[in-house]
Amino acid sequence: MRFVAGDFYAGLVEGQHLDAVYRSPGLSPYAIAPVLVAAHVTGTRASGELGLYVQALDALRTARGYAPAVLAITGTNGKTTVTSLTGQLIEHAGKSVAVAGNIGPTLLDTLSAHLDSNTLPEVWVLELSSFQLDAVNAFEPTAAVVLNVTQDHLDWHGTMAAYAAAKSRIFGQHGLMVLNRDDPAVMAMLPEPVKVKLQRPQVRAHITFGTDMPQRPGDFGIEEVNGMVWLVRALEADETR
């Protein structure tokens, strides 16, 4: 193994015959841009810990048929609390669960430990930071939530738009989106409906939550009745029969 100190430059990749480049989430995309560009030009795969985790799950699915539910959580504030509570709720529901990611321990350490002990869980609950999400392209959770987006880490991302874009990668292309309808930056992550010939436009599967009463079936909100505050969910019409 060769260690290199100093600035990142294209020569670290060009002509090196590398199989892949793996980046630490602590390195901003601007600092390592020459390396990432060189990797793209040379066709060298670039990834990070989350990408390796995705690869590992894909390999386990092929080899063992292992297909756990993956719940992913991010947001500027509150993600550690929500991750911890989600893990506890799933455990109390009788499911085996692993909680990992930004909350600690790391994704790969947790996966390795479960492989060693032959205790692969039914559900993964992942706390993911914008740093981890910035580098991922093929992450497809079962469901994911962005709790909120407020100004933070602009020294790393450069702009609020780039920061929000990194957060939005948590949803992948197919997973259920769980959105904070009180936060315009989060709601802006919902894709526009897809027009389909002779059919209604198709809306990406999603539910929302907020501090007001929910109006859309499946959404969650808050209702105050006789001085008591309740968490409520709007029902489908046939659920009330």
Predicted regions and their residues:
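Glycine-rich, highly charged phosphate/nucleotide-binding loops
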Residues: 2-14
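Short beta-strand elements of ligand-binding domains
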Residues: 3-6, 47-50, 208-211
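Short, surface-exposed charged micro-motifs
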Residues: 219-221
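Short polar/acidic secondary-structure junctions
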Residues: 138, 213-214
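A short, charged helix-loop
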Residues: 237-241
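Basic, alpha-helical nucleic-acid-binding regions used in initiation and control of genome expression
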Residues: 20
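Phosphate-binding loop of NTP-binding sites
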Residues: 12, 16, 25, 29-202, ...
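Internal gly/pro-rich beta-alpha loop/helix module
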Residues: 3, 189, 193, 206-209, ...
